[in-house]
Amino acid sequence: MLYRVSGFYKRHTRNFTNIDYGYYIRNFIHHIASKIYPYAKVVLPNFRAAHYFYILTLVILGSILVYPVKTCAYIDVLFFTAGASTQAGLNTVNVNDLSLYQQIVLYLLATLATPIFIHGSLLFVRLYYFERHFDNIKERSLMDYRMRKSATLARLGSAPTMSSTRLNTFNNQVLGFQEREAEKGSSSSPQSSSSQTSQPVSTAYNDQGGNDIEHHSEPSDSDDDESGNGPVTFQEKIHFEEPQRPRSQRRHSRTDSGIKFSALPHPRRRKSIDPEDMYRSINMLQEHKKNQEAKSKGIQFLNIGSPVRRKSRSSNIEAFPEEDTNPSRDDEITPATNSVGTGNNDEDEDDILIIKPPIEIENSDGANPIFTKKKKLASQIQFKETPGKAKKWITTKKRKHYNPWTSKLKKTLSNSSKKGSLSVVPTDTEDDSEDEEYASIDSETSDISDNEHAADNAEGSDVDSVGSYEEDEDEDEHNSDDDDDDDDGEGERRLGNGASLTKAQSHLVLPSKDETGGKKYTKRSNTLDTPQQNTSDGRKIRKKAPKRKTPRTQRNASFNQHSNVSIGDGSIENVDTNDSYQRLSRTMSGNYLSWTPTVGRNSTFIKLTDEQKEELGGIEYRAVKLLIKIIVVYYVGFNIIPGVMLSIWIYCMPHYKNLMISSSISPAWWAFFTSQSSFNDLGLTLTSNSMMSFNQNAFVQILCSFLIVIGNTGFPILLRFIIWVMFKTARPLSLYKESLGFLLDHPRRCFTLLFPSVPTWWLFFILVVLNGFDLVIFCILDLHDDTFKGVDMGYRVLNGLFQAFCTRTVGFSVMDLSQLHAATQVSYLIMMYISVLPIAISVRRTNVYEEQSLGVYAKENAEGVDESAPSNYVGSHLRNQLSYDLWYICLGLFIICIAEGKRLKEQDLRFSIFAVLFEIVSAYGTVGMSMGYPGVDCSLSGEFNVISKLVIIAMMIRGRHRGLPYTIDRAIMLPNAAMKRHDRLQEEHAINRHNTMERTTTLGRVATFGNGPIDGGNNLLTRAITNIEHRLRNRRDGRSESSTVSEDPRYVVRTVSEV
């Protein structure tokens, strides 16, 4: 019985503790929302309508809560609650005359109506919809994170600095030297050296990251040795430690030692070249030069032949059979050749180690070794003493016919997928007979290498230094045009001592992704930023940066779209691909996606699959969840901490404490109310003269200035700075860092008041300029005014700065505004009007659906896009804002002038039309600054009648909605079918925009200058194809356009001056 009771208690206790309260809360909210939604959809169709409803609700509800105390008339109560709900801050009655209860209600209304609170609440709504309408989004996002982290750790743990091909080449090199050691260490017949079993080789290598990573290569197939003693297995363990060359390599790097590889599996692409072969040869050449004798007549160095495509054999060299599995091949080598004890080093140095390809090893019967030896040919690449004038290697270039147009077109046609929107796909039927002439004599077959790339590699190297590749890359970057124009058939380079160097050709083709899991590289076509890679001997290899620089607006609008152009039949076919990553607009700050995104302007993701959309939705969900925590801490912290600071300060200052007590104000309540009014931009104070009592106190003015900035205009700046600091201090590869990286890269997909880096810097610059302008005007016109008698000069400047901060947001007054210079008053009037524009324009220009919000929708065909469309829409936003504002201000001024006609006829200087306009603009800008009126402790609005007060209330409510985002804004939309439709439209618009910018940029560069185009002929094929498109379009549309014929008669290009 006791056992049953215990089990029942444990079962129910476990069920109680495992209750998902969030699930029940979401169900409850969903139940209520499903009942209200059909009616709310009609009344509140968009975010702006919902915002109006929320503000009006707070105004009316607040008036209901405040009025029962009956300390003032209802119109004044309504005026107070409207000012608190809109942060206008105008008052018709002294705030200190209200009861504490009424002050607390105003305090809460201001806290619940700030932009930070309202826009932050949208994050909770979006988070609810994420969890409610996407099944298991939390679990899926966590699984995606673990997958990305595991993949990243696996990639970091598998030596990312060495590709599979490079590692395979290095291993085979070690095999050759190991066999050499076996031959040298044997004192018996040559057959005894071949019968020894090879031991595992351990080689040291230095990894830049300092990771001690151990890698085990795959064991080769078991092959019997020549004596039949058993299989030979080669397993290598590479420890990343201090870089050093193998002992055998250091000991036997002589003039005639060499390694030769048979044909490896060929990728399905045109031949490319790995610079490692050439640089290894140069390195071994330098090692040899240190040990050579003074009277040596010639130098020979190692030439590593790379795999080639074709199976034909060279007609002018001795070829070794590719499928030779006869084990007696080694027997053809005389004993004198392999003998160590004979001392015949010349004969011994004529052996070449040939490693068979994996396919040949797999197809063999297992009785043959994986490597054989043969006599090295006498036609090895070497230095020869040739008469003639000494010339430099790099600077001397042999030229034939230099034609910039022909050379650039040839380079464009020979390179695959150059950075740009057009790429030429090379065919296997191209005839490169000119390159056959310079094929490597050590190659097993007679494949044709890309001679142009080999020449560039040779010209970009320096023989005299081992680690000079990085410097030569920089030099080649600046002189790339000259290098490309050199004759590809040039076979010799000259040294300073008069010796000529025959080029070392390499035919190594990197494996394709399908065969070996590696990446495809070509020297000139790869434009994706990749990490630096190291060769097997410790040298770094860097990828070239793209030579063409594009404007920021073009880079932001770019995405991956390649056009495969077939020149043979004259057809032009545009093909969109998702596998190429050449036109990325930006890189990811964190490892938050398992794929490389294609991003257009304003964080528009292009060409996403369903799986990618799910992964993107998961990281966006976690980013929103993290952002909620940051904003909650930010908002609560800056509402409480400054109040505590002011409380400590005022209790430590007896003068100000007694001032509060004499005015029947609690010092602690003053501290919290003032800090909250500053941070929430309310503008109301418990003291009757606003902040004039503190015009000679730096602490209050500086602290309140900081709160005023970070609570309004400076909020996006400080928020992004906080996220950036958190990102920099976050633990690598953590879920926390991924979410922060997504917020930094794509902030407007998550939050309306968080902007990208460039708009944030612009906002900071505008903030500094506007406040600096107000301070300068004040110092010029009012610094020495009689109003500031008795105030030190330093405090006068501080007062001017404090008033500049208050002018555009909170509306505090540290001086009598009516006594200032007229020009200063006008400048303050202008600043109050433009107070919301920096935030409003930043919100709208960073909108993901910016074009759609302005009515610029994507066309079905790219030809319908207007090429003269602007790259940004700041002018459109400003025009919309002016059309939204001006008529309402004019209408309000007209109504008040009618209602206050009698007072205006009295010609009272403190009740003039300018003073009324100043009050209207202050209410419409939700600032709360007023010229005041003599004898009263409130704003000028206290002298208005009921109609004028209602107009001011309407101005407050209308002006509070100036800075709202457009109706079509992704950050305020719920993840539903409407959002998917807008995403699809924005994607189409981004594609058409990219095509338009490509055409515009191309046409803007084609004006001829001298003997060729201004850009030196870059992107010539793109221009030619673009011209064909324009000519065909003009012919179809029946339009005639003037064209400019360049000096090359084969191309007709348009000249566009206004781009």
Curated annotation (Swiss-Prot):
GO terms for molecular function: chloride channel activity; high-affinity potassium ion transmembrane transporter activity. Keywords: Cell membrane, Chloride, Chloride channel, Ion channel, Ion transport, Membrane, Potassium, Potassium transport, Transmembrane, Transmembrane helix, Transport. The chain crosses the membrane at residues 47-67, 100-122, 626-649, 697-713, 758-781, 821-844, 878-899, 946-968. The keyword Protease does not apply. Residues 180-276, 304-350, 404-574 are annotated as: Disordered. It is found in: Cell membrane. Its main location: membrane. Residues 540-552 have a biased composition (Basic residues). Coiled coil: none annotated. Residues 74-90, 669-685, 797-813, 913-931 dip into the membrane without crossing it. The keyword Cell membrane applies. One of its GO terms (cellular component) is plasma membrane. It is a multi-pass membrane protein. Induction: Induced during biofilm formation. Expression diminishes when pH was altered, either to acidic or to basic conditions. Residues 1-46, 123-625, 714-757, 845-877, 969-1059 are cytoplasmic. TRK1-mediated chloride conductance is blocked by 4,4'-diisothiocyanatostilbene-2,2'-disulfonic acid. InterPro entries: Cat_transpt, K/Na_transp_Trk1/HKT1, Trk1_fungi, TrkH_K-transport. Residues 186-203, 412-423 have a biased composition (Low complexity). It comes from the Eukaryota. Residues 68-73, 91-99, 650-668, 686-696, 782-796, 814-820, 900-912, 932-945 are extracellular. Residues 335-344, 524-536, 556-566 have a biased composition (Polar residues). Potassium transporter that mediates K(+) influx, as well as Cl(-) efflux as a secondary function. TRK1 is the major K(+) uptake transporter that regulates membrane potential and intracellular pH. The TRK1-mediated Cl(-) efflux should serve as a Cl(-) detoxification route and may play a role in sustaining C.albicans on mammalian epithelial surfaces, or in physiological saline solutions such as saliva. Mediates candidacidal activities of cysteine-free peptides, but not of defensins. The hallmark of salivary gland-secreted histatin-5 (Hst 5) killing of C.albicans is the rapid efflux of cellular ATP and other small nucleotides and ions from the cell as well as concurrent intracellular uptake of propidium iodide (PI). TRK1 is the channel for Hst 5-induced killing and histatin-5 may directly or indirectly alter TRK1 function, allowing the efflux of larger anions, including ATP, and the influx of small cationic dyes, such as PI. This is Potassium transporter TRK1.
